[in-house]
């Protein structure tokens, strides 16, 4: 499928894309957290930020940014530390709010949807490893002798985004249902938020120690 556009072993790629999307990461966790705390609208706004951020990174990967990042350690480190700092900030903010006993009901009935989108976008964009990953993964399924490799890259990128959309939609809908239960279980909600905050701190530590 799509062989005429320079795509090799598309079905193998699709299976690989599904497994990759299923691996838990900060983007997935952020979407799930907001679907639980802010409902389906908050979840989809977070997902939208992730989609746009990933699309930008895929375009940069295709445009050659991956090579620049790999050959310029200082650039890689700048983006890496910015991403780690932002993850640490998000994790610390969640933990602080949880320990102080703050919750969405006490703050406001209306979540800050604009902030949710911006945080998701920044979270997605400040991951230099993503650009390197897209190139290393996509190149295995692109015929370098094809006349228009940009089309091949676009097909693979679109497929990955669609798989991600399906999975995040499942998480968002599940999170919205969980919200109805958690609202009556304050202690459970507190434990859940604490775990999410700690996971963000863990993601920050992992990103800070990555090498290009």
From Swiss-Prot:
- Gene Ontology BP annotations: L-leucine transport
Keyword Ribosomal protein listed? The answer is no
* Xref: Pfam families: LysE (PF01810)
GO molecular function terms noted in the UniProt entry:
antiporter activity; L-leucine transmembrane transporter activity
Q: State its location(s).
A: Cell inner membrane
Q: Which UniProt keywords apply?
A: Amino-acid transport, Antiport, Cell inner membrane, Cell membrane, Membrane, Transmembrane, Transmembrane helix, Transport
* Bilayer topology annotation: Multi-pass membrane protein
Residues spanning the membrane: 12-32, 49-69, 71-91, 122-142, 153-173, 188-208
* Catalytic activity, as annotated: L-leucine(in) + H(+)(out) = L-leucine(out) + H(+)(in)
**Acyltransferase among keywords:** no
GO annotation, cellular component aspect: plasma membrane
Q: Where does it primarily localize?
A: membrane
**What job does this protein perform?**
Exporter of leucine.
- Give the UniProt family note: Belongs to the Rht family.
What is this protein's name?
Answer: Leucine efflux protein
Per the UniProt entry, what species is this protein from, by scientific name?
Answer: Escherichia coli O157:H7
């Amino acid at each position: 499928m799509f062989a005429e556009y320079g795509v090799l072993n598309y079905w193998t790629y699709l299976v690989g894309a599904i497994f990759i999307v299923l691996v838990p990461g900060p983007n997935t966790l952020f979407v799930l957290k907001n679907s639980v705390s802010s409902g389906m609208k908050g979840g989809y706004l977070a997902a939208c930020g992730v989609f746009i951020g990933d699309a930008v990174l895929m375009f940069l990967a295709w445009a050659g940014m991956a090579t620049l990042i790999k050959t310029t350690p200082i650039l890689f480190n700048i983006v890496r530390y910015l991403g780690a700092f932002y993850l640490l900030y998000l994790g610390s903010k969640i933990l602080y709010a949880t320990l102080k006993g703050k919750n969405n009901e006490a703050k406001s009935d209306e979540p800050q949807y604009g902030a949710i989108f911006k945080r998701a976008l920044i979270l997605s964009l400040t991951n230099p490893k993503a650009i390197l990953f897209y190139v290393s993964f996509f190149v295995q399924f692109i015929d370098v002798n094809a006349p228009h490799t940009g089309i091949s890259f676009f097909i693979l990128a679109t497929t990955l985004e669609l798989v991600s959309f399906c999975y995040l939609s499942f998480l968002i809908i599940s999170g919205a249902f969980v919200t109805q239960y958690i609202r009556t279980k304050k202690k459970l909600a507190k434990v859940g938020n604490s775990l999410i905050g700690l996971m963000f701190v863990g993601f920050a530590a992992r990103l800070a120690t990555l090498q290009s």
